[in-house]
Design a protein with these regions (language model features):
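Extended, highly charged segments
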Residues: 1-166
């Protein structure tokens, strides 16, 4: 986590660099923060068209192993997805969070995969969030997300907040 001011200067961070360190990319208070460019194979999920989403899925599944987990594919293909969000997209599509690429392709669920992907990320484009804290039945917090999480069913208690800063 990196906190920056309006000019992208680092105010604080969860882990700052040492000035004398030999890190290629130093993270120090007062320095301008420049995020790393996205790897070429990972693209932003925001503003993604259905055609692009489906073409990328097909290209990946044509070259890989059909048993490859769909959530892992989403993590490798799109920047900014968390493992929780990737599993949630797959869960909303297939009813399980560990479905394979082949399972989704064989069951004709690719369009539904896109619709669930879009259902999570279209609100983000409009700065609409559903901050959600997930607790185990004993009250222990184990997940936090910007959107509703359904994959845990009755094994989790969801606590919704009005804003991300609550």
């Amino acid at each position: 986590i990196i906190l920056c001011d309006c000019e992208h200067k680092v105010i604080s961070a969860l882990r700052l660099s040492e000035l004398a360190s030999d890190e290629k990319r130093k993270l120090l208070c007062g320095f301008v923060y420049e995020p790393l460019p996205l790897p070429e194979h990972r693209i932003s999920p925001l503003g993604l068209s259905k055609e692009t989403f489906l073409a990328r899925f097909k290209a990946f599944s044509d070259t890989g192993d059909g048993s490859y987990p769909c959530d892992k594919y989403l993590l490798s293909a799109y920047a900014g997805l968390s493992p929780l969000t990737a599993r949630e997209i797959v869960f909303r599509t297939a009813g399980v969070s560990d479905a394979s690429l082949a399972a989704l392709s064989d069951r004709g669920l690719l369009e539904n995969l896109y619709l669930n992907f879009e259902a999570i990320y279209r609100p983000v484009e409009k700065n609409i969030f559903a901050p959600t804290l997930l607790k185990k039945r004993d009250g222990e917090v184990f997940e936090f997300s910007f959107c509703d999480i359904l994959q845990y069913g009755n094994d989790a208690v969801a606590v919704r907040f009005d804003s991300m800063s609550e």
